Amino acid sequence: MELNGIKPADGAKHYKRRVGRGIGSGIGKTAGRGHKGQKSRAGGYHKVGFEGGQMPMQRRLPKRGFKSQLLKFNAEVTLSALEQLGASEVDLVTLKQAGLVGELAKVVKVIMTGKISKAVKLTGIGATAAAKVAIEAAGGSLA
């Protein structure tokens, strides 16, 4: 082996194909775009969903349902998040300061995900039936 004989392994390098650089390259002149037509031109392609002037699928199908704007005021907190919080008394302000709920949250509910071992007193916060049982079993309460 000599320094002038070192080269990358076969298939290790993929060189960028230079198109439009003469007939001898095998991919000159039209550069793989064919002849004429929209797709052969610079900037020539349709919008996503364009079906050649036919009424597109997205407009043929009926509208359905709606997204409630009230959902942005609702938030969920898990039992494991309450465990990590480490506070003995928790209310909406505490959760916002800890970053567990968003600033817009007005209604918060504790859900049964994870475990809780510390006693936590919740004020102004709801809980699912299973989460309520788990909180009370750990010595906590809901007010």
UniProtKB/Swiss-Prot annotation:
Keywords annotated in UniProt: Ribonucleoprotein, Ribosomal protein, RNA-binding, rRNA-binding
SUPFAM superfamilies from the UniProt entry: Ribosomal proteins L15p and L18e
Superkingdom field: Bacteria
One GO process term, biological-process aspect: translation
Region (Disordered): 1-59
GO cellular component entries: cytosolic large ribosomal subunit
GO function term, MF aspect, one: rRNA binding
UniProt KW Ribonucleoprotein keyword: yes
Bias type Gly residues, positions: 21-31
Coiled coil: none
Family membership noted in the UniProt record: Belongs to the universal ribosomal protein uL15 family.
Known function: Binds to the 23S rRNA.
HAMAP family, alphabetized: Ribosomal_uL15
Name of the protein described by the UniProt record: Large ribosomal subunit protein uL15
Protein's organism: Albidiferax ferrireducens (strain ATCC BAA-621 / DSM 15236 / T118)
